[in-house]
Amino acid sequence: MATYEGKVFTEEQEALVVKSWTVMKKKTAELGLKFFLKIFEIAPSAKKLFSFLRDSNVPLEQNTKLKPHAMSVFVMTCESAVQLRKAGKVTVRESNLKKLGATHFKYGVVDEHFEVTKFALLETIKEAVPDMWSDEMKNAWGEAYDRLVAAIKIEMKACSQAA
């Protein structure tokens, strides 16, 4: 079982994550964009963190660079959650994890950004699978997200110490 700060990512949590991801996988482009639109709705200033959005006057929904980025982040986050228990740890490829840490450090991502992103992720999943949604599913996805963020923060800290 995957453990993290004394918590265990259970078989039941894994089943909830896998079941919902199986449904969501069919709509990753749409859900990824919804996910990011929620982030920017909650925290409009987060747009400044993305170079391709800073000077753009194009509506977010039509930004050709946002859509693929949003889908990529959504898929990576969900796949990481699905693999968590099986691997016993966050399974973003090591080189990607280092890159994620470096990128998040470079652009000045802080705890509040991760919290907004978590809220947006959970809301996106809730809307994507309303018939499956429960407190247990919310907790399972929340736990998986928290572990991914913890792994990214470790890499961010390594970057800050190297700077």
From Swiss-Prot:
The keyword Nucleus applies. A motif (Homodimerization) lies at residues 41-45, 111-123. One of its GO terms (cellular component) is cytoplasm. Heme b binds at S51, K65, H69, K99, T103, H104. Its EC number is 1.7.2.-. Binds 1 heme group per subunit. Its cofactor is heme b. This is Anaerobic nitrite reductase HB1. It comes from Gossypium hirsutum (Upland cotton).
